[in-house]
A protein has these predicted regions:
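Carbohydrate-active catalytic/glycan-binding domains of CAZyme proteins
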Residues: 27-324
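Basic polycationic patches enriched in arginine
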Residues: 3-6, 11
């Protein structure tokens, strides 16, 4: 997909039309980024804008015993991505059981970057810290931040969110239950009660977005190993809910990709446009761990509701990152 632009040459008697060639080359840079956005089996991607670059923090999609680390990827335009290997390695996280490194969530506060991660298929949710968005990250507590199965929620799939008033929250949960708990200013301790906020059909992968004073709570539902996987959302007036299921917004397409889910959303800088970053399986793939990271448009209607996402092979147009 290429954006259509009308270009008029100001030089009427230039046989080689060098000006038009330059314009054509400029238009070529507007070609879509293409999906998947980088090679390799990666799932559960969280997309951010930090320090003038886009960052994607995914799960390495493989057998649990091979999931012993986290990589991340950075880009200045959503098109060209640089891999940062092993930004956190479970050999340095003694309590992790050295397996099942899942669903990292990264957030910036006071010049530091905090990563909340799942370990050991339910061993707990940890928190690691770095001075740089590309790491390396180091485990802060030497133990899980969340270990117990509270309100029936498996301690996996954390998502950190800071509201406009500065209050930080941690959403998390598998096994069809979701909790939210406040984080202290230091970002490595919880405070207060764990509140269950499970909406209808919730399975895992919570994500929170604030837009226009409303709280858009999103999650994955269905089975992650098959084509039933997808994303739904709710709208609330508070980060604590209640979250009443609105509709399904992300599904697979057998011609493009299946099992589309476990996503994140980002507003592009200097625009009112949003993108959704998610994983899916290539068409006709039946391999459990063959999941790839993609980006497509997320469109809000005038009434604030979200349109169903159209998943594509082309993806979105490149867009330059800027420092916040």
């Amino acid at each position: 997909m290429v954006r259509a632009l009308r270009v008029t040459c100001a030089r009427q008697h230039n046989s080689d039309c060098s000006f038009m060639i330059v314009c054509t080359l400029a238009l070529m840079t507007l070609a879509s980024i293409g999906n998947p956005i980088f090679p390799g089996d990666y799932a559960d991607p969280e997309l951010h804008l930090f320090q003038g670059k886009y960052y994607v923090y995914p799960t390495y999609s493989a057998a649990y015993d091979k999931q012993t680390f986290f990589d991340c990827f950075s880009s200045e335009d959503l098109r060209e991505w640089k891999k940062h290997s092993r930004i956190l390695d479970f050999k340095d996280v003694a309590w992790s059981t050295n397996r099942a490194a899942w669903a990292p969530s990264v957030i910036e506060r006071d010049g530091m970057f905090y990563m909340y991660f799942s370990a050991g298929d339910g061993a707990g949710i940890g928190v690691a810290k770095s001075a740089h968005p590309e790491g390396p990250f180091q485990d802060v507590l030497g133990k899980p931040l969340v270990k117990e199965y509270i309100n029936g929620a498996q301690p996996i799939d954390a998502m950190a969110f800071i509201d406009d008033d500065g209050q930080a929250y941690l959403y998390y949960g598998g096994w069809k239950h979701c909790n939210v708990v406040k984080l202290k200013r230091n970002m490595v301790e919880t405070e207060g009660q764990f509140k269950e906020v499970t909406p209808e059909n919730y399975v895992e992968g919570p994500f929170m977005l604030k837009r226009g004073g409303k709280y858009y709570f999103m999650w994955s539902e269905g089975g992650w190993t098959n084509s039933s996987y997808g994303v739904a959302y709710a709208i609330a007036d508070s980060p604590l809910g209640p979250f009443v299921r609105k509709s399904h917004i992300l599904d697979g397409n057998p011609e493009v990709g299946t099992g589309a889910g476990h996503h994140s959303v980002l507003k592009l800088p200097r625009t009112d446009e949003y993108v959704i970053c998610y994983h899916r399986r290539p068409p006709k793939s039946t391999l459990r761990d063959n999941r790839v990271t993609c980006i497509d448009k997320l469109i809000f209607k005038e009434n604030g509701e979200i349109e169903p996402v159209v998943i594509t092979r082309e993806g979105v147009l490149p867009w330059p990152a800027i420092k916040k």
